Regions:
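Catalytic strand-loop segment that frames the active site of acyl-thioester-processing enzymes
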Residues: 1-51
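HotDog/MaoC-like acyl-thioester-processing domains
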Residues: 1-9, 89-132
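Generic structural detector for well-ordered beta-strands
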Residues: 13-15, 80, 129-131
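Short, charged/polar low-complexity linear motifs in solvent-exposed/disordered segments
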Residues: 28-29, 41, 75-77, 128-129
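Hydrophobic beta-strand-centered segment that forms part of the acyl-chain substrate-binding groove
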Residues: 47, 56-98
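Noncatalytic linker/hinge segments flanking ATPase motor cores
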Residues: 50-56, 117-121
Length: 132
C-alpha cells in the first residue's frame, strides 16, 4: 500500500456486544456498572449500557492495524470521546471507523480518524502517529 497524505482508508466496522464488554471489564478491572448493568445505566440517565471509552479507543487502534498492517507501531494516540457507544442486550453493535493519512515522513505516518455507531459520532479528533 502506498502511503500518501490525504489518502482515505476504506471504512472498517467492528462489532461489540455485552459479552465483549464483560470480558473487557474483567481484563481492565473497570467494573463500573454503567458498562455492565442496564438498570443502573438507565438510573443515571443513560439510554442503556455503554461501552468503555478505552475499549472503543482500542478498537480504533485495531482499525488502524487493519489499514496499515503490523509493520507500523502506534507511538502516539489521542481522541475525544464525543458520545457513548450504546450496547443494548442481545445485540451486536457496529462501530464504523473512517480514516485518512494526514502526513508521511521517512519513518512516521500520521493518521486522523473518526468513529460512528448507530449513525452517531462517538470518537472525534482522533490522531495517531506510527513509526516503521
Amino acid at each position: 500500500m502506498a502511503l500518501i497524505p490525504g489518502e482515505l482508508f476504506a471504512e472498517k466496522t467492528l462489532y461489540i456486544n455485552r459479552e465483549k464488554l464483560r470480558r473487557y471489564a474483567e481484563a481492565s478491572g473497570d467494573h463500573n456498572p454503567i458498562h455492565l448493568d442496564e438498570n443502573f445505566a438507565k438510573s443515571v440517565g443513560l439510554p442503556n449500557v455503554i461501552a468503555h471509552g478505552m475499549f472503543t479507543m482500542a478498537l480504533a487502534g485495531e482499525a488502524i492495524r487493519f489499514w496499515v498492517g503490523d509493520e507500523w507501531q502506534i507511538v502516539d494516540f489521542s481522541t475525544r470521546f464525543t458520545k457513548p457507544v450504546v450496547v443494548p442486550a442481545d445485540e451486536e453493535v457496529g462501530i464504523t471507523f473512517s480514516g485518512k493519512i494526514s502526513e508521511v515522513s521517512e519513518t512516521n505516518i500520521f493518521i486522523e480518524l473518526s468513529a460512528t455507531s448507530a449513525g452517531v459520532k462517538v470518537l472525534g479528533q482522533t490522531k495517531a502517529r506510527l513509526i516503521f
